[in-house]
Amino acid sequence: MKIGIGNDHVAVEYKNVIREYIEAKYGYEVINYGTDSSERFNYPVSGEAVANAVVNGEVDKGIVICGTGVGISLAANKVNGIRCVTCSEPYSAKLSREHNNTNMLAFGARVVGIELAKMIVDAWLTGEYEGGRHQVLSLIHISEPTRH
Protein backbone atom coordinates (compact mmCIF):
# COMPACT_ATOMS: atom_id res chain seq x y z
CA MET A 1 0.00 0.00 0.00
CA LYS A 2 1.13 3.55 -0.70
CA ILE A 3 0.31 6.39 1.65
CA GLY A 4 0.72 10.04 0.68
CA ILE A 5 1.65 12.38 3.51
CA GLY A 6 1.58 16.16 3.53
CA ASN A 7 2.21 18.90 6.05
CA ASP A 8 2.93 22.55 6.63
CA HIS A 9 5.89 24.10 8.48
CA VAL A 10 4.27 23.50 11.89
CA ALA A 11 4.10 19.74 11.38
CA VAL A 12 7.49 18.80 9.90
CA GLU A 13 8.52 16.73 12.94
CA TYR A 14 5.14 15.00 13.13
CA LYS A 15 5.26 14.16 9.43
CA ASN A 16 8.70 12.60 9.78
CA VAL A 17 7.79 10.58 12.88
CA ILE A 18 4.50 9.33 11.39
CA ARG A 19 6.18 8.50 8.08
CA GLU A 20 8.86 6.40 9.79
CA TYR A 21 6.24 4.81 12.08
CA ILE A 22 4.04 3.66 9.18
CA GLU A 23 6.99 2.34 7.19
CA ALA A 24 8.35 0.40 10.18
CA LYS A 25 5.05 -0.96 11.55
CA TYR A 26 3.11 -1.65 8.35
CA GLY A 27 5.79 -1.85 5.67
CA TYR A 28 3.85 0.66 3.55
CA GLU A 29 5.58 3.05 1.19
CA VAL A 30 4.98 6.62 2.37
CA ILE A 31 5.38 9.37 -0.22
CA ASN A 32 6.11 12.91 0.99
CA TYR A 33 4.03 15.74 -0.49
CA GLY A 34 4.80 18.19 2.31
CA THR A 35 7.59 20.50 3.30
CA ASP A 36 10.75 19.57 5.17
CA SER A 37 11.44 23.19 6.11
CA SER A 38 10.47 25.22 9.16
CA GLU A 39 10.00 28.21 6.84
CA ARG A 40 6.37 29.30 6.52
CA PHE A 41 4.53 26.98 4.13
CA ASN A 42 0.97 27.32 2.86
CA TYR A 43 -0.87 24.19 4.06
CA PRO A 44 -3.42 24.09 1.18
CA VAL A 45 -0.56 23.30 -1.22
CA SER A 46 0.29 19.98 0.43
CA GLY A 47 -3.34 19.20 1.32
CA GLU A 48 -4.38 19.47 -2.31
CA ALA A 49 -1.24 17.66 -3.52
CA VAL A 50 -1.99 14.61 -1.37
CA ALA A 51 -5.68 14.72 -2.32
CA ASN A 52 -4.83 14.81 -6.03
CA ALA A 53 -2.42 11.90 -5.56
CA VAL A 54 -5.22 9.87 -3.93
CA VAL A 55 -7.82 10.54 -6.63
CA ASN A 56 -5.28 9.99 -9.42
CA GLY A 57 -4.27 6.61 -7.95
CA GLU A 58 -0.66 7.56 -7.22
CA VAL A 59 -1.29 6.59 -3.58
CA ASP A 60 -4.02 4.54 -1.89
CA LYS A 61 -4.70 6.85 1.07
CA GLY A 62 -3.49 10.17 2.39
CA ILE A 63 -2.53 11.68 5.73
CA VAL A 64 -2.20 15.44 6.17
CA ILE A 65 -1.01 17.42 9.18
CA CYS A 66 -1.02 21.11 10.01
CA GLY A 67 -1.41 23.03 13.28
CA THR A 68 -5.02 21.97 13.91
CA GLY A 69 -5.68 19.58 11.03
CA VAL A 70 -8.72 21.63 10.06
CA GLY A 71 -7.34 23.92 7.36
CA ILE A 72 -5.41 21.21 5.56
CA SER A 73 -8.46 18.91 5.60
CA LEU A 74 -10.62 21.66 4.12
CA ALA A 75 -8.08 22.08 1.32
CA ALA A 76 -8.05 18.33 0.68
CA ASN A 77 -11.84 18.11 0.66
CA LYS A 78 -12.01 20.61 -2.21
CA VAL A 79 -10.80 17.82 -4.50
CA ASN A 80 -13.68 15.80 -5.95
CA GLY A 81 -13.67 12.24 -4.61
CA ILE A 82 -11.87 13.04 -1.36
CA ARG A 83 -13.36 12.25 2.02
CA CYS A 84 -10.85 13.68 4.49
CA VAL A 85 -11.65 13.52 8.20
CA THR A 86 -10.00 15.57 10.94
CA CYS A 87 -9.55 13.48 14.10
CA SER A 88 -8.13 14.12 17.54
CA GLU A 89 -8.83 10.65 18.95
CA PRO A 90 -8.75 7.06 17.61
CA TYR A 91 -12.45 6.17 17.89
CA SER A 92 -13.59 8.71 15.31
CA ALA A 93 -10.69 7.78 13.05
CA LYS A 94 -11.69 4.10 13.05
CA LEU A 95 -15.40 4.82 12.53
CA SER A 96 -14.61 7.26 9.72
CA ARG A 97 -13.12 4.32 7.83
CA GLU A 98 -15.79 1.79 8.81
CA HIS A 99 -18.84 3.99 8.19
CA ASN A 100 -17.70 6.76 5.84
CA ASN A 101 -14.91 5.10 3.85
CA THR A 102 -12.64 8.09 4.35
CA ASN A 103 -9.62 8.12 2.08
CA MET A 104 -7.69 10.83 3.91
CA LEU A 105 -6.92 11.54 7.55
CA ALA A 106 -5.97 14.90 9.05
CA PHE A 107 -4.85 15.84 12.55
CA GLY A 108 -3.20 18.77 14.26
CA ALA A 109 0.37 18.89 15.50
CA ARG A 110 -0.72 21.56 17.98
CA VAL A 111 -3.72 19.50 19.11
CA VAL A 112 -2.55 15.92 19.70
CA GLY A 113 0.68 14.54 21.12
CA ILE A 114 2.80 12.32 18.91
CA GLU A 115 1.86 9.09 20.72
CA LEU A 116 -1.84 9.90 20.37
CA ALA A 117 -1.20 10.73 16.70
CA LYS A 118 0.23 7.23 16.23
CA MET A 119 -2.87 5.73 17.87
CA ILE A 120 -5.11 7.76 15.55
CA VAL A 121 -3.11 6.60 12.52
CA ASP A 122 -3.31 2.96 13.69
CA ALA A 123 -7.08 3.15 14.17
CA TRP A 124 -7.55 4.77 10.76
CA LEU A 125 -5.22 2.47 8.83
CA THR A 126 -6.72 -0.70 10.33
CA GLY A 127 -10.35 0.37 9.99
CA GLU A 128 -12.11 -1.32 7.06
CA TYR A 129 -15.17 0.01 5.29
CA GLU A 130 -18.28 -1.98 6.21
CA GLY A 131 -20.45 -0.88 3.27
CA GLY A 132 -24.06 -2.05 3.51
CA ARG A 133 -26.34 0.46 5.17
CA HIS A 134 -23.50 2.98 5.39
CA GLN A 135 -23.12 2.98 1.64
CA VAL A 136 -26.82 3.35 0.97
CA LEU A 137 -27.56 5.95 3.64
CA SER A 138 -24.42 8.02 3.68
CA LEU A 139 -21.87 7.76 0.91
CA ILE A 140 -24.29 8.03 -1.97
CA HIS A 141 -25.74 11.20 -0.44
CA ILE A 142 -22.33 12.62 0.46
CA SER A 143 -20.97 11.97 -3.04
CA GLU A 144 -23.81 13.77 -4.82
CA PRO A 145 -23.07 17.42 -5.65
CA THR A 146 -25.27 19.93 -3.89
CA ARG A 147 -27.61 21.79 -6.18
CA HIS A 148 -28.75 25.28 -5.20
Located regions from the model:
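A short beta-strand-loop structural module common to alpha/beta enzyme folds
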Residues: 29-40
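Mid-chain, well-packed structural core segment of small domains
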Residues: 65, 70-106
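Short active-site oxyanion
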Residues: 2-3, 59-62, 81-83
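Short, structured active-site "lid" loops
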Residues: 46-64
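Short, glycine-/small-residue-rich phosphate/pyrophosphate-handling segment
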Residues: 90-134
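A short, Lys/Arg-enriched amphipathic alpha-helix followed by its capping loop at the start of a domain
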Residues: 17-28
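Conserved small/polar residues in nucleotide/adenosyl-binding loops
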Residues: 140-146
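N-terminal beta1-alpha1 ligand-phosphate binding loop
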Residues: 2-18
